């Protein structure tokens, strides 16, 4: 349990992984669902959403693509790969990239 909590804190704060990626990586290491849920509870919802908002705004400005659809796809792929929830990613993509 201690490993899972430290893993979640580190990967969330340093690598900026979302909950889906954290869950998958812990499952890959044969950690039980109960321990995974306890570890994910360490992440404050407000902090989670604030980090997501900051990262998305920064990323939207970094992507240099003139075609809106390609830019949106790159944006979406970037965050889905890092395990952020798809409904959050799509909502933010259509909000920031027009």
Regions inferred by a protein language model and the residue ranges of each:
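An alpha-helical, amphipathic repeat domain used for nucleic-acid recognition
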Residues: 1-98
């Amino acid at each position: 349990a201690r490993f899972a909590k430290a893993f979640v804190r580190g990967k969330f704060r340093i690598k900026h992984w979302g909950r889906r990626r954290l869950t998958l990586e812990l499952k890959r290491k044969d950690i039980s669902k109960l321990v995974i849920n306890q570890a994910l509870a360490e992440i404050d919802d407000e902090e989670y959403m604030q980090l997501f908002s900051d990262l998305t705004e920064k990323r939207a400005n970094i992507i240099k693509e003139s075609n809106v659809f390609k830019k949106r796809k790159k944006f979406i792929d970037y965050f889905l790969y890092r395990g952020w929830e798809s409904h959050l990613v799509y909502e933010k993509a259509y909000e920031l990239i027009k």
